[in-house]
Regions:
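Substrate-gating cap/lid region and adjacent catalytic-acid/histidine neighborhood
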Residues: 260-263, 267-398
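A conserved short beta-strand
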Residues: 213-225
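Short beta-strand immediately N-terminal to the catalytic nucleophile in serine-hydrolase-like folds
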Residues: 193-196, 220-222
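Short glycine-enriched nucleophile-adjacent loop
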Residues: 200-212
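Non-catalytic accessory segments of hydrolases
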Residues: 1-167, 188, 298
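Alpha/beta-hydrolase active-site loop
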Residues: 161-183, 235-244
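A short beta-to-alpha transition loop/helix N-cap that caps and shapes the active-site region
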Residues: 150, 201, 225-232, 331-334
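Surface-exposed acidic, glycine-flexible loop patches that form ligand/cofactor-binding
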Residues: 94-106, 132, 179-187, 210-213, ...
């Protein structure tokens, strides 16, 4: 519906005013944007570390003209803190709106983007992921924020803080899409979720989790899966206590730790979690998940749990069309780790097993040694692991 001041959409929770936008890619095909739409209550105070709380309806018209705050994280370009805990927003971009007067309803296919960033950084805002191309192809695009790092994935392995808050945020957003996307010209029966890296792992996890069943009808995972070695935290409770010690609280009491973490400003949590990157042991190991301290994890068997077993136990998952893949030389991200840990090349040269995926490192010592030698010979022949042969190492890590 068009009204003075911009397009108006009435959802099941209340009315929103958006903008009519001229696309940069196809100026002759304008679209409508509705930004900064809340899909859950702000997860602050007592709601920190809890599943998202349903949003209450409102009266009047809310502006949906600007993107909402991003969730707290370290901004990757400038390595600075950014965000606010009041961050559970999504954005909707649509090429056509229903017309109540004429009865016109476009019922367009819907794509929901789940951003990547190691479950620790990023947002769904248009800073990196603009809508013009997909909207120009006749798609209703939804992008979203979800809680990151400790705020999104810390687990005490109990009912109070069972973990996976960020994944549950995504579920809440998908429920919002099912309830409301028809008012933006989308078809709730043609929803495809897609994501990259941690977003791809999230997509695959939704295919496997019972709590996401029926919320989408197709999935695209770009460079990541639920079974990627970096996508699941082992012993997540220990990581929570490590975070407490990094913040100056040395306790073995779960309730005491939780009280402290709930009272700590989000900026301090984010910065302390960043210092945990690479703690303990061989922290530069290519397959180490310790370098990503807060990740999805297995939860206790409680109502609303996202996973109560490892993702592989849920395979094959939802019976929906699924597209997945990766790009050549994605392992170039390794160069950033080399900058932080210059001894890595020499360590890998001496202990090449460290680059072998865990799934190939099973069996007895002789079987593992044979696999290691075969992989090394395939990529390096007789050459050493050094900067002269960095392309080969990038290929291995890809």
């Amino acid at each position: 519906m068009r009204v003075g001041g911009g397009p108006l959409v009435t959802t099941r929770l209340g009315s929103l005013r958006g903008r009519r936008v001229v696309a940069r890619s196809t100026p002759q095909a304008p679209y409508y944007s509705f930004k900064g739409i809340r899909y859950a209550e702000p997860p602050r105070g007592s709601l920190r570390f809890r599943p998202p709380a349903p949003l209450e309806p409102w009266s009047g018209v809310r502006d949906a003209l600007e993107e909402g705050s991003v969730c707290p994280h370290r901004f990757m370009l400038f390595d600075t803190y950014k965000g606010d805990e009041d961050c559970l927003f999504l954005n909707v971009y649509t090429p056509a709106l229903p017309d109540l007067m004429s009865g016109y309803n476009p019922q367009l296919p819907v794509m929901v983007w789940i951003h990547g960033g190691a479950f620790a950084v990023g947002s769904g805002n248009a800073f990196l992921y603009g809508p013009d191309h997909l909207v120009g192809a006749g798609v209703v695009l939804v992008t979203l924020n979800y809680r990151l790092g400790a705020l999104g994935f810390l687990s005490l392995e109990n009912e109070e803080v069972s973990g996976n808050m960020g994944l549950k945020d995504q579920v809440m957003a998908l429920k919002w899409v099912q309830d409301n996307i028809e008012f933006f010209g989308g078809d709730p029966n043609r929803v495809t979720i897609f994501g990259e890296s941690a977003g791809a792992a999230s997509v695959h996890m939704h295919m496997l989790s019972p709590v996401s069943r029926g919320l989408f009808h197709g999935a695209i995972a770009q460079s990541g899966s639920a079974t990627s070695p970096w996508a699941l935290a082992k012993e997540p409770k220990n990581r929570a206590f490590e975070l407490g010690r990094e913040l100056g609280i040395d306790t073995n009491n779960t309730a005491e730790l939780l009280g402290y973490l709930r009272a700590t400003p989000s900026e301090l949590l984010v910065k302390a979690a960043a210092r945990l990157f690479g703690i303990a042991g061989k922290t530069a190991d290519l397959q180490s998940t310790v370098a990503l301290p807060f990740l999805p994890s297995v939860e206790p068997d409680i109502p609303g749990a996202f996973f109560t077993d490892e993702p592989k136990a849920y395979l094959p998952g939802a019976d929906v069309p699924f597209l997945t893949g990766y790009n050549a030389q994605e392992g170039i991200l390794l160069l950033r780790r080399l900058q932080r840990y210059p001894k890595l090349l020499n360590e890998i040269d001496n202990e090449f097993q460290r680059v072998i995926p865990p799934k190939l490192s099973t069996g007895g010592p002789e079987a593992v040694a044979k696999i290691v030698n075969q992989v090394r010979a395939f990529y390096f022949q007789q050459r050493p692991v050094d900067m002269r042969n960095i392309d080969s190492l990038i290929d291995v890590s890809t």
